[in-house]
Amino acid sequence: MSAKPFSHPITVHPEDIDFMGHVNNARYLGWVQDTVLAHWQKLAPAEEVASKAWVALKHEITYRRPAFLHDAVIAETVLEKIAGARSFYNTVIRRGEEVLAEVQSMWCCLDSETHRPARISKAVAETFFGLPAKAKTTGA
Protein backbone atom coordinates (compact mmCIF):
# COMPACT_ATOMS: atom_id res chain seq x y z
CA MET A 1 0.00 0.00 0.00
CA SER A 2 1.34 3.40 -1.02
CA ALA A 3 0.75 6.76 0.58
CA LYS A 4 -2.14 8.91 -0.62
CA PRO A 5 -1.37 10.71 -3.92
CA PHE A 6 -0.32 14.35 -3.65
CA SER A 7 -1.13 16.80 -6.46
CA HIS A 8 0.97 19.87 -7.19
CA PRO A 9 -0.06 22.44 -9.84
CA ILE A 10 2.60 23.63 -12.27
CA THR A 11 2.66 26.74 -14.41
CA VAL A 12 4.76 26.63 -17.57
CA HIS A 13 6.82 29.83 -17.82
CA PRO A 14 8.67 31.30 -20.83
CA GLU A 15 12.04 30.31 -19.32
CA ASP A 16 10.90 26.65 -19.33
CA ILE A 17 10.68 26.62 -23.14
CA ASP A 18 13.60 25.38 -25.22
CA PHE A 19 14.65 25.97 -28.84
CA MET A 20 12.04 23.45 -30.05
CA GLY A 21 9.14 25.48 -28.64
CA HIS A 22 8.22 23.14 -25.79
CA VAL A 23 9.29 22.60 -22.19
CA ASN A 24 12.93 21.54 -21.92
CA ASN A 25 13.25 17.95 -20.72
CA ALA A 26 15.43 18.95 -17.76
CA ARG A 27 12.62 21.15 -16.42
CA TYR A 28 10.47 18.08 -15.75
CA LEU A 29 13.01 16.98 -13.14
CA GLY A 30 12.74 20.39 -11.50
CA TRP A 31 8.99 19.92 -11.35
CA VAL A 32 9.44 16.54 -9.68
CA GLN A 33 11.72 18.13 -7.10
CA ASP A 34 9.23 20.94 -6.48
CA THR A 35 6.45 18.38 -6.05
CA VAL A 36 8.33 16.06 -3.69
CA LEU A 37 9.43 19.00 -1.53
CA ALA A 38 5.91 20.45 -1.46
CA HIS A 39 4.62 17.02 -0.36
CA TRP A 40 7.20 16.89 2.47
CA GLN A 41 6.46 20.47 3.56
CA LYS A 42 2.70 19.89 3.61
CA LEU A 43 2.66 16.63 5.59
CA ALA A 44 5.80 16.50 7.74
CA PRO A 45 5.77 18.09 11.20
CA ALA A 46 7.19 21.65 11.21
CA GLU A 47 10.24 20.65 13.28
CA GLU A 48 11.09 17.94 10.72
CA VAL A 49 10.71 20.36 7.81
CA ALA A 50 13.03 22.82 9.60
CA SER A 51 15.70 20.24 10.47
CA LYS A 52 15.82 18.15 7.28
CA ALA A 53 16.84 18.67 3.66
CA TRP A 54 16.38 16.42 0.63
CA VAL A 55 18.67 15.47 -2.23
CA ALA A 56 17.84 13.39 -5.27
CA LEU A 57 19.78 10.14 -5.60
CA LYS A 58 18.19 8.78 -8.77
CA HIS A 59 15.56 9.67 -11.37
CA GLU A 60 14.19 7.45 -14.10
CA ILE A 61 11.98 9.42 -16.46
CA THR A 62 9.84 8.41 -19.41
CA TYR A 63 8.73 11.32 -21.59
CA ARG A 64 5.34 10.78 -23.27
CA ARG A 65 4.22 14.17 -24.66
CA PRO A 66 5.59 17.74 -24.74
CA ALA A 67 4.29 20.56 -22.57
CA PHE A 68 3.94 24.09 -23.95
CA LEU A 69 3.90 27.66 -22.67
CA HIS A 70 0.90 28.43 -20.44
CA ASP A 71 -0.22 24.78 -20.24
CA ALA A 72 -2.05 23.88 -17.02
CA VAL A 73 0.05 20.99 -15.76
CA ILE A 74 -0.37 18.86 -12.63
CA ALA A 75 2.27 16.65 -11.04
CA GLU A 76 0.80 13.84 -8.97
CA THR A 77 3.27 12.06 -6.75
CA VAL A 78 2.95 8.97 -4.59
CA LEU A 79 5.38 8.05 -1.84
CA GLU A 80 5.82 4.31 -2.36
CA LYS A 81 8.29 3.40 0.38
CA ILE A 82 10.63 4.74 3.05
CA ALA A 83 13.84 2.83 3.76
CA GLY A 84 16.03 4.42 6.42
CA ALA A 85 16.98 7.84 5.05
CA ARG A 86 15.72 7.04 1.54
CA SER A 87 12.27 7.68 0.10
CA PHE A 88 10.94 6.30 -3.17
CA TYR A 89 8.42 8.30 -5.20
CA ASN A 90 6.43 7.74 -8.39
CA THR A 91 5.35 10.96 -10.08
CA VAL A 92 3.09 11.41 -13.11
CA ILE A 93 3.01 14.78 -14.85
CA ARG A 94 -0.24 15.46 -16.73
CA ARG A 95 -2.01 18.05 -18.83
CA GLY A 96 -5.65 17.17 -18.25
CA GLU A 97 -5.92 13.42 -18.80
CA GLU A 98 -2.84 13.36 -21.03
CA VAL A 99 0.30 11.90 -19.43
CA LEU A 100 3.33 14.02 -20.26
CA ALA A 101 5.94 12.16 -18.22
CA GLU A 102 6.33 9.39 -15.65
CA VAL A 103 9.16 9.56 -13.12
CA GLN A 104 10.43 7.10 -10.55
CA SER A 105 12.81 8.75 -8.11
CA MET A 106 14.83 7.99 -5.01
CA TRP A 107 15.58 10.72 -2.48
CA CYS A 108 17.84 10.93 0.56
CA CYS A 109 16.84 12.82 3.69
CA LEU A 110 19.68 14.83 5.24
CA ASP A 111 20.17 16.49 8.59
CA SER A 112 20.21 20.15 7.52
CA GLU A 113 23.07 21.02 9.91
CA THR A 114 25.46 18.11 9.35
CA HIS A 115 24.40 17.25 5.79
CA ARG A 116 24.57 13.59 6.79
CA PRO A 117 21.80 11.10 5.95
CA ALA A 118 18.95 11.20 8.47
CA ARG A 119 16.59 8.25 8.94
CA ILE A 120 12.89 9.00 8.72
CA SER A 121 11.28 8.09 12.04
CA LYS A 122 8.32 5.74 12.21
CA ALA A 123 6.19 8.55 13.63
CA VAL A 124 6.96 10.79 10.65
CA ALA A 125 6.38 7.93 8.20
CA GLU A 126 2.95 7.38 9.75
CA THR A 127 1.96 10.94 8.84
CA PHE A 128 2.54 10.07 5.18
CA PHE A 129 1.11 6.55 5.09
CA GLY A 130 -1.65 6.95 7.65
CA LEU A 131 -0.98 3.50 9.11
CA PRO A 132 1.57 1.91 11.40
CA ALA A 133 4.93 2.82 9.89
CA LYS A 134 6.32 -0.72 10.14
CA ALA A 135 3.97 -1.68 7.31
CA LYS A 136 5.77 0.60 4.83
CA THR A 137 9.24 1.28 6.21
CA THR A 138 12.32 -0.86 6.28
CA GLY A 139 15.58 -0.54 8.12
CA ALA A 140 17.62 -0.55 4.91
Label each residue range with its predicted role.
Residues 1-74, 80-140:
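Terminal targeting signals and extreme-terminal segments of soluble enzymes
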